[in-house]
Design a protein with these regions (language model features):
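Active-site neighborhoods and metal-handling regions in enzymes and metal-associated proteins
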Residues: 1-222
Length: 222
């Protein structure tokens, strides 16, 4: 039942992202903060989404190099810019976690980055689904290799984490990495939780070109 609820939360969230595009909210000359505010209004007014389980992220230009804990200065979307949006809506008490990249313009390098990070997500998903046992650290290293295979650097500290009914499971030790896809988490991702239930993982990819100061992002439920 949990997987079905999570898939429903993701489905609603994907429709939400489509509405962001259909309403032409992503345009040059708009600040990240303004776009974030408009996204929140759309979530509430169109989809009845009031709560998000993690901070709402809109990052453009060089801010796309920032990792989740960072809080870079507000930036204005420019012509031929790249940006990504990372949202964690709560839908009927279940968590979604969706990230998408957008390119304002036709810059070929940025379009390649957008396409490569999305294609890599599905390649990794297909590989993951063939496994019956897998350390989180092994998936992280596989994601790093996929980034390098496409000519990018892997920009994130993690390559994912668990989700569930809000609030999702937390480790007994707040400093533990056991519920993150992290290079130092050598636990099997297929292990059940403390109650014997299946864990559900988000795969998040951030590919970057540090020299050109651009990053691409794609995230959703494995």
């Amino acid at each position: 039942m949990t997987k079905e609820k999570l898939l429903n939360a993701q489905y609603i969230s994907v429709q939400f992202f489509k509405a962001i595009e259909e309403n032409n909210l992503i345009i040059a000359g708009k600040s990240e903060e303004q776009l974030n505010s408009e996204i929140c209004d759309l979530a509430l007014n169109r989809f009845g989404i009031e709560k998000h389980w993690h901070k709402k992220i809109v990052r453009a230009g060089k801010n796309t190099l920032a990792i989740y804990p960072d809080n870079p200065p507000n930036r204005t979307i420019e012509k031929d810019d790249i940006l990504f949006i990372d949202l964690g809506p709560i839908v009927e008490d279940y968590e979604a976690d969706i990230g998408r990249t957008y390119v304002v313009g036709i810059d070929p390098r940025k379009l390649k980055l957008k396409n490569d990070v999305e294609a890599a997500w599905y390649d990794i998903r297909d590989w993951y689904q063939k496994q019956t046992t897998l350390k989180a650290s092994e998936l992280f290293q596989y994601a790093v290799a996929k980034a390098e295979e496409s000519g990018w650097e892997f920009g994130g500290e993690i390559a994912g984490h668990i989700v569930g009914k809000f609030p999702h499971e937390q480790p007994a030790d707040p400093q533990s990495l056991e519920l993150d896809i992290h290079p130092e988490n050598h636990n099997d991702m297929f292990l059940p939780d403390a109650n014997g239930n299946e864990r559900h993982w988000i795969l998040e990819l951030q590919f970057i070109d540090r020299k050109k100061e651009i990053g691409g992002y794609f995230e959703q439920l494995l």
